[in-house]
Design a protein with these regions (language model features):
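Glycine-rich NAD(P)-binding loop of Rossmann-like domains
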Residues: 113-145, 172
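Phosphate-coordination loops involved in phosphoryl transfer and adenosine-cofactor binding
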Residues: 81, 130-134, 205, 214
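N-terminal glycine-/charge-rich "phosphate-binding" loop or analogous flexible N-terminal tail
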Residues: 1-40
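Rossmann-like adenosine-cofactor binding region
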Residues: 164-216
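Short acidic low-complexity segments
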Residues: 28-39, 50-53, 169-185
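Short, well-ordered coil/turn residues at beta-beta hairpins
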Residues: 7, 46, 65, 192-195
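Phosphate/diphosphate ligand-binding glycine-rich loop within oxidoreductases
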Residues: 41-115
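NAD(P)-binding Rossmann-fold cofactor-contacting core
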Residues: 152-169
């Protein structure tokens, strides 16, 4: 009986090896199970075509191999009664936080100008942009990790989430009024919101107009 089914397009042999190190007795399959799909209990998916899970009628859990589950939830044939889990991988969180920090510092020190026109802009002549407040929309696993990194480097961090949250050294806001507060006071705005029906198109022109002049 195959207990765990891995996607064939995401380094399945490495995943299989790691899982077997944790549980040598685990029965693992790779790719679509055609002979006995009813015996599959757990699946790992990522950006799967709609209907991929149709044959697996006895699933106990679905794991999305990423931090967002929007690709799975968009499948109209996703079994509604089966719990869905997502990864909370510290390495992936660090990569995202470093990317965000790089983007903020590149803008703050006007590095793009130096890269595009190095011969016209003497090194050190650009003005350091003012503003030290980073607003983070979405205080989940990724948002919290990013907040910690910005705090370590002396940034002031404001965060917004749908429901109330408390994070050390972070000014936390929630709800519509809280969103307006973060939008209108952030020098740098970062969105780490999950893509759902409630967050899609949240940052529209109306929201952008609430941001302070010169915000990035």
């Amino acid at each position: 009986m195959i207990q765990l089914l891995l996607p064939e397009h995401m380094q399945p042999q490495e995943l299989r090896k790691e899982r077997l190190e944790l549980d040598p007795g685990l029965k693992i399959g790779i790719g679509p199970e055609k002979e006995s799909p009813e015996k599959v209990e757990f699946v790992v998916i990522w950006n799967q075509p709609h209907g991929t899970l149709r044959p697996y009628r006895n699933l106990k859990a679905i794991c999305v191999y990423g931090h967002g589950v929007d690709s799975a939830l968009q499948d109209p044939e996703l079994p509604k009664e089966v719990p869905i889990f997502r990864l909370a991988d510290q390495t992936m969180a660090l990569w995202m936080s470093e990317y965000l920090l790089t983007a903020v510092l590149m803008h703050r020190r006007q590095m793009v100008m130096h890269i595009r026109e190095p011969e016209n802009i003497p090194w050190g002549r650009t003005v350091r942009l003012e503003g030290n407040r980073v607003g983070i929309l979405g205080l989940g696993f990724l948002g919290q990790d990013a907040a910690k990194l910005f705090l370590k480097l002396g940034f002031e961090v404001w965060g917004w989430s749908r429901s109330p949250k408390t994070l050390a050294d972070v000014s936390c806001f929630h709800g519509n009024e809280g969103l307006d507060e973060v939008l209108s006071n952030s020098d740098f705005l970062i969105s780490l919101l999950p893509l759902t029906s409630e967050t899609e198109n949240l940052l529209d022109l109306k929201c952008m107009k609430k941001m302070k002049k010169g915000a990035y």
